[in-house]
Amino acid sequence: MGKVLVDFQEIESYKKNNICGRPGKEGTCYYLTDDIIVKIFHIFVGNKRVYFDDIKNDFIAFPIDVYFDSMVKLETAYTMKYLAGTGLINGFPSGARIENVKQAYINLRKVIEEYQDINMYDMCLANILYDKSTNSFRLIDTSRWYPSNNAFSKNIEQFNNCLCYSLFRHNLDWISELSSVKELRELDKLHKLYENYLDNNFPNFQELLDTVSYEICKKSDKKIKN
């Protein structure tokens, strides 16, 4: 067992070229602040799917499925499950508001900006938690942190792309519904962002949240369920 890095704890030691391996083998207990997380991998090599189970914290969202998706060229967890018994809703925990998620994104981006020379190896949604109680994203369990030129842009890009992928994944039915009506499709900014995304041009996550809020909640008379 070992302590998981949370919110850039002990970052200064990494700026001194120290390297940290994973804080324990998969299936052992990890510490997240004062709570204990039991993180269990079930790896199926054939379809490259990884499952996570059992987390002891009522406020933490944690991925339940992980895909290794060639399109985004990084490990991507596309299902984030709120494990307090409320189930999955649109990739984010039940009760998380769009404005809160957007602010959490802005806040963590600012933190990443402070450490532009630190590269976060193995950043993926499997290692990005959304904490509803504090309205914040946390980065945990990175394989290595090390000084790197132009790390800031790479870190921001991966963080941004992971979250965009998760949001698109869980709203494809709404996007398809909007896109099936020609008049809406021609005016639909969300559909345009999705087309760009399919071409591997990821939108800014903040812009995407704003667009989802407007296009889905207003145009289609639907309310996003988070």
Protein language model features and the residues they cover:
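A short, low-complexity linker immediately N-terminal to eukaryotic Hanks-type protein kinase catalytic domains
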Residues: 1-17
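Conserved kinase catalytic-core helix
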Residues: 89-132, 137
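Active-site-adjacent loop/helix micro-motif of nuclease/hydrolase catalytic cores
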Residues: 44-51, 89-93, 148-155
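ATP-binding glycine-rich loop module of kinase domains
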Residues: 12-61, 65-67
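Conserved hydrophobic "DFG−1" position in protein kinase catalytic cores
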Residues: 31-32, 82, 129-131
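Conserved structural core of kinase catalytic domains
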Residues: 59-104
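Short acidic-glycine loop/turn motifs at beta-strand connectors
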Residues: 34, 70-71, 131-134
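C-lobe/activation-segment region of protein kinase-like
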Residues: 131-226
